[in-house]
Each structure stands twice: as C-alpha cells, then as structure tokens.
Amino acid sequence: MLYNNAADFEIAKVLKQDIKIYFDTLEETFATSGGKDFLVKHTKKIDSILKHVYKVATRDMFGDYLPMKNSIPLSLVALGSYGREQLCVHSDIDLMLVYKDVPGYNVKELIEKILYILWDTGLKLGHRVHTVDELFDVSKTDITIKTALIESRMIEGSSFIWMETQNAISQIRHDDVEEFIQQKLQEQEEKHRKYPLTMEPNLKEGVGGFRDANLVFWIGKIHFNVENIKNLPAHIINEKEYKTFRIALEFLFRVRSALHLVSKKKEDKLRLDLIPYVATILGYENSKKGHMRFAKKVTDSLKTVRLYSTIWIETLTRDYHK
C-alpha cells in the first residue's frame, strides 16, 4: 500500500500501528541490551522510520521520474541526543531538514509532505527547517541551536547538501568559542543549583547527570572536533579514568531508559515512588535492601560522572575562567 498511491494519512496510519508494536516490545529489547547499546538500537529504529517516510514522500512526489537522492537538494539531519545516538525512549526526536531552494525542485512541498506524515504517526517530533545558507546566522540567535548543530548527524537525503551543512557547522564550531564556553559553564552552574544531588536526582539536568557528560563532549568537539569523549587528547583524559567514567555513565543510561519504560513517558527525575519499579526492571531484589542498593549505585554513579567531568572540563576550559 505504501508505494501504490496511498493517501498520506493511510501511510501514516500503517506506520503508527508499526510504531505501536515496536514500542510494545521495547522492554524485551531492553532486557537483552546494554545501556548505550539500547539507545543506539532505538535511534536506528527511528532512523529507519524517517528513511521510510523520505522514500515514500519522494516516490509520491516524483513518481516514475524519481531522481537520485543526491540530486534532490534536501537532507534529513538528527540533532541533540538523537544526533549523538543517545535517544531515550520517550524523548523528543530532534530533526532538522536542510535544503537548497533550487528552481525545478519543489523542495518545500516535499518537506511539508514528510512532516505531515511524521506528525500523523504520533512520533514526538521536534523539527527545524533551514536552508544551508541560513545555518550560521541561525546558530548565532540561540546557544541551544548552536549546541544541537555541533552534534548533528545525517540520516537520509543528499550527501551534497550534508557536505555543505558540515562546512557550515565547521564555521559555526569556530565562531565565538570563548562566548560559547562561558555560556555553557554558566548554564551548568544554573542547572546544578536548580537540580542538586538529592534522594530524587534529575538524571539529565542535575549534578553528575548526562548534561555534565554532554558538556565535556561539547567543549571537546569545539576544541578538537572529536566524535566522542574517549578521543580527547591523552593529556586531558587517560584510559583508566575514562573506563571508570564510562561504567558509571553506562549504568545511568540503563537507569534512565528503565525510568522512561516504567513511567511510559519522558521522565528524568528518579522519584522515590518509582525506585522499586526501576530497580526491579534492572534486576535488583524487590526488597527494601535491594532498593537501597540500587539507589546507592545511582548516587555513586552520579558522583563519578560529576568528578571526572569536572576534572576534564576544568582542563579544557582553564583559559576561559574569569
């Protein structure tokens, strides 16, 4: 049906049912996956849905005269945690559609078709639409946008547009480096004040949470264009430190995924009433002692991430402290 001139809403209806079946089986997938591995699997599944929608939309637009992908001036780009392949189950899917307004291609209509189908599937989509030439100016309007752009990843579409996008991102990465770092450090301080390490920690925004780990990556990306933290230079990070940090982070990935699965929604605060359910899904004994062991490991892991991220951020930013 998807390739036989079906209406967009019919396509979305079929995809919506497939997505529901997929989400219903996530706990089984989680049980046999590691922390980051589960996030990568989920990310790849979302990638496959977006690629499918792109394929359907382009075939519908061009029919028997479908050009090569590289000839259609549009790329679908993942941003944020989706770009890092760390997309949690109920987190928003941050998508950017980058295009060039080339005469002869009705790219804007194609973009609308893609978005309408995706909206109708029920996916929690956050999207941006920009021409390649807009990216630099857009990045200067909001530090959140700049941050998202420097951790972007191509999903589908024209590799030519993606190459131009990468060139724009390289320019963005080198622009106002000191101001970017100062703003991110200030942002971190504010988040730590708002979400201190308590008995109900915020795994994303709080002390020792994913934002601390992300900040190491963002600053490392700005300075060294690394693809992950472990690729930072040896004078900043050593293998033993990284291994300890990574074990803690891997555990927190599993905790956050379990928290989303148990809550059946986006939830980053490990509330006391949820601890028994999250602990159980992670294999801890369903008893007060088991719950306490789990809560202690969460706290210890957050402290580990906080410790090493602080050391590395201090080294990476020592020239920018005022």
PLM region spans:
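A nucleotide- and high-energy phosphate-metabolite-utilizing enzyme signature
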Residues: 1-322
